[in-house]
Amino acid sequence: MTDAFYASPLPGILLWAALYVSDFLFTMLCARMYNDGAANQVHFEGSYEITPYYQKEVDALRLVSPRFLLALAATCALQLALWWMTIRVLFVPQLFFFALGAMVLIEATVHIRHLRNFFLFRAILAKDGITGRIEYARPVMLRMSAVELFSFSAAYGVIYLMTGSWFVLGGVVSCLLVAINHRQLAQKHVPRTTRFSATDNTENTAL
């Protein structure tokens, strides 16, 4: 199966693009569910979107997003350049699979989070066995994200030790780096002095 990735950059680009688009659509779907009522029981301080680059887009539920299209084009171009340099110029395919794994496995990890939120929010909206209300300050939300990503990095690390896969090693590193970033964001967060309504689309959001 890996032969297809050696022969052409297209399989890697298509895989990445499919995951990236799916990530964005899942984010918008869960953000809408959150704003439609899930936030009345599970409320997160600040934006639903953790990544600052996308927060305004997600807060506005902007499905057609120039920022997203620009990022998609840039990352696909990056993957094309990585394939050309590692496979055709340097002849070090391990580096390509490391980079591919870093991109794909962080997205796979994020998709697990999306699925968790989707089923949680669906249960809340259906009033299916979830009662009460809980609020998370943004630093707590970011620390939770960091712990989750550290855990995935460790899990991928165990798989790497058993397989020696450069693809999996890429996932170890990318999850670790994003976890560190979220931890740093939590430490830098300045608490809000104003409390916002759970139905305000511009300030309401979640993990």
Label each residue range with its predicted role:
Residues T2-L207:
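Hydrophobic alpha-helical segments at protein termini of multi-pass membrane proteins
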